[in-house]
């Protein structure tokens, strides 16, 4: 056990899906996993382990922002032997051609956070997803006939940013979605020798002000979840 996870040793599978919302973790476990059991509940950050088509998989919330998700990702990797983390979350779009509810596979993550500079001796660290996880996710999406976008995310430290002009810069550089965790998770995975990927569903559009409801974010976004789960099976087949 750790200060933040009260699961016993061996409670987690080697692959963990991580939404920000612990209630989304509960939804994923109850909807997609068989024989799912809750294995941790410290601070109501729920974690579950079950099987998907016979494959043992865990799901656990990571909270909001890089500090929170980094704690859980680090402890899962170093204390529970987790090898792969797939973040399944929401993001905001800044480009006009990116639409509400589209699925984005984040091959890289820009950020205004300094966490990766701290761990990388104040140099720029290229926060990127694992190639094999990315490839498997793209293949899973194609197999299910789900259109996805593949490209860069932006992990912001501030949800309510005062620098709205930065959205213009993001759009110029082709950023597909703004969220708050991917760069941190990629940094943790690199530091501790694990693999990581972020898959996001567009929950709101910063330009058009369209948005999904809190209930929709908690109980839908199934395409993203199915892509993540199927990608695990594809990854197993490819070794």
Curated annotation (Swiss-Prot):
UniProt key word Transferase: yes
UniProt-listed Enzyme Commission number(s): 2.4.2.1
Gene Ontology terms describing biological process: purine nucleoside catabolic process
Binding site for phosphate: 20, 24, 43, 87-90
InterPro entries (UniProt xref): DeoD-type (IPR004402), Nucleoside_phosphorylase_CS (IPR018016), Nucleoside_phosphorylase_d (IPR000845), Nucleoside_phosphorylase_sf (IPR035994)
Binding site for a purine D-ribonucleoside: 4, 179-181, 203-204
Molecular functions per Gene Ontology: purine-nucleoside phosphorylase activity
Role description: Catalyzes the reversible phosphorolytic breakdown of the N-glycosidic bond in the beta-(deoxy)ribonucleoside molecules, with the formation of the corresponding free purine bases and pentose-1-phosphate.
Recorded family membership: Belongs to the PNP/UDP phosphorylase family.
Protein name per UniProt: Purine nucleoside phosphorylase DeoD-type
Annotated source species: Glaesserella parasuis serovar 5 (strain SH0165) (Haemophilus parasuis)
Classification lineage: Bacteria, Pseudomonadati, Pseudomonadota, Gammaproteobacteria, Pasteurellales
